[in-house]
Regions:
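Membrane-interfacial helix-loop segments of redox and metal-homeostasis proteins
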Residues: 1-358
Length: 358
């Protein structure tokens, strides 16, 4: 496939994903949250009893769909390639910090785009921080940062994460008493939608869509393919929001900083939260969406990162790190600062390749 065709497919996939994300709000998801990998993993962690924040406990079918969409597409295209063994503990810790940064901002990079598409100008500060974090990560990449190579694994090992996802689906359908579900109307965890994740997972697998990769590749290689997907999601969701606002009698686009759904107006911490997320995602090699897609393709490294995201969500809600519409917490601010320092240390320790080669 030529680069021109790849870019065309990326734009098409981004537009479709943006429209799907907007329609999910129409079908019941919270506004500006048709998709949010961080928030949905947080909800799932709560459902599994990893935290006790009652308003955000639900096994999100979108997460299950993303993994299965990637898994089935990878099998169909013979791209299921189990690999792993690259600094698993470091990846777990970085995954936790990605979640801490995301829950400071109240959204992952995917939701950041959707917040912009819904008119939330607070997301502009998040985007600025996200870009700055990526630039810091690119600095270390240029200096030789690497978590070292991964190794080929057995098909059985690569299938563990999809099987675990299947088990979570069984829990969602069976709804046993030990699984926690937000009561209808009590919070975003209850406002669930159909499994659109299958389509998004398949499209993301085929196009290698990554929110971090767009800015990273543009800076490193002057390559625009991934950032076209980023922009296309924004355009697709924005246009769909405007159409829905004009045809349904409900506003899906509200331009401004104040009174935005599931958001706060503290610009500094919106910036720093997404800076941590962007920086840590570069060190991991992909955004939370990309980590889920790679997990479906058989990457145990990405599966470990997803476990880190789940653990980070538990920490955020068990220890008061997560922000709310009222703003960030003191504990959350401290955690973001610790995360930024830890990310710099991890990046520095693992930046040695070019230095040793000199």
């Amino acid at each position: 496939m030529t680069l021109k065709n790849e870019k065309r497919n990326m734009i098409f996939a981004g537009l479709v994903i943006g429209v799907i994300a907007s329609l999910l709000v129409l079908f019941g998801n919270p506004k500006n949250m048709g998709f949010c990998v961080a928030c949905f993993l947080r909800d799932t962690a709560g459902a599994l009893g990893l935290h006790s924040a009652e308003a955000v406990q639900y096994i999100r079918p979108e997460i299950i769909g993303l993994v299965f969409g990637s898994f089935f597409m990878a099998l169909a295209k013979k791209e299921f390639s189990p690999r792993g063994g690259s600094a698993p503990v470091t990846r777990f810790v970085l995954g936790m910090f990605v979640m801490i940064g995301s829950l400071m901002f109240l959204g992952c990079p995917f939701r950041m785009i959707l917040r912009l598409a819904g008119g939330d100008l607070n997301a502009l500060l998040g985007l600025a921080g996200f870009a700055c974090g990526i630039l810091v990560g690119v600095f270390f990449l240029n200096k030789g940062y690497s978590l070292k190579r991964s190794y080929a694994l057995t098909k059985a090992e690569g299938g563990v994460f999809p099987v675990l996802t299947l088990a979570v689906l069984a829990l969602l359908l069976a709804a046993p008493a030990f699984i926690h579900f937000t009561e209808a109307g009590n919070g975003p965890g209850a406002m669930h939608a159909p499994i659109a994740g299958l389509a998004v997972g398949a499209l993301a697998q085929r196009t290698r869509l990554c929110m971090v990769g767009g800015i990273r590749d543009l800076v490193l290689f002057k390559e625009t393919k991934l950032i076209l997907g980023f922009a296309a999601i924004l355009v697709g969701a924005l246009v769909c929001n405007l159409i829905l606002s004009g045809t349904t009698g409900t506003s899906y686009f509200h331009l401004g900083f104040a009174d935005q759904p599931i958001a706060h107006t503290d610009g500094l911490w919106n910036f720093l939260g997404m800076m941590l997320t962007g920086f840590a995602c570069v060190l991991l090699g992909g955004c939370p969406l990309r980590q889920l897609i790679l997990s479906g393709e058989g990457s145990s490294d990405s599966a470990v990162t997803v476990f880190g995201l789940l653990a980070g969500a538990a920490f955020c809600h068990n220890f008061g790190l997560a922000s709310s519409a009222k703003g960030p917490t003191a504990n959350g601010k401290a955690a973001v600062v610790v995360g930024l320092v830890a990310a710099v240390v991890i990046a520095s320790v693992n930046t040695f390749k070019k230095e040793n080669a000199k």
